[in-house]
UniProtKB/Swiss-Prot annotation:
Annotated source species: Vibrio parahaemolyticus serotype O3:K6 (strain RIMD 2210633)
Membrane-crossing residue ranges in chain numbering: none
Subcellular location: Cytoplasm
Protein name from the UniProt record: Sulfurtransferase TusD homolog
Gene3D superfamilies given in the database record: DsrEFH-like
Name of the gene encoding the protein in the UniProt record: tusD
EC number assigned by the record: 2.8.1.-
Amino acid sequence: MGGLTYTLVVNGSVYGSQSARSAYQFAQAVIEQGHTLVSVFFYQDGVTNGTALSVPANDEFDLTKAWQGLAKEHDVRLETCVAAALRRGIISEDEATQHGLTQNNLAEGFVQAGLGSLAEAMLTQDRVVQF
């Protein structure tokens, strides 16, 4: 039997709670066990995982870079909810242009998506796990 497909939903901020770090550790375990992590959907305060402007202290784990590395190595989509991101100042280049802003700060490897993307994942993945 082949492995299962997973999507993770991360609601916790990049450094404000243990939620996002736990999700990252779970993502690693899913992949190590031979399953496929299709996407990670960052929602509510979880969208802060996708900021390019987070600079942790030298002795702290850089969770944004960790997500980027995992996505690149294992072809995982990193999606921030566009509405939640805009409310929290996480802006993609496209959204900046659309709203007449001169700056953007969505980290490389992350994309902004709507709730339809999460709904599709719920219908098509074997497992959706929320953190």
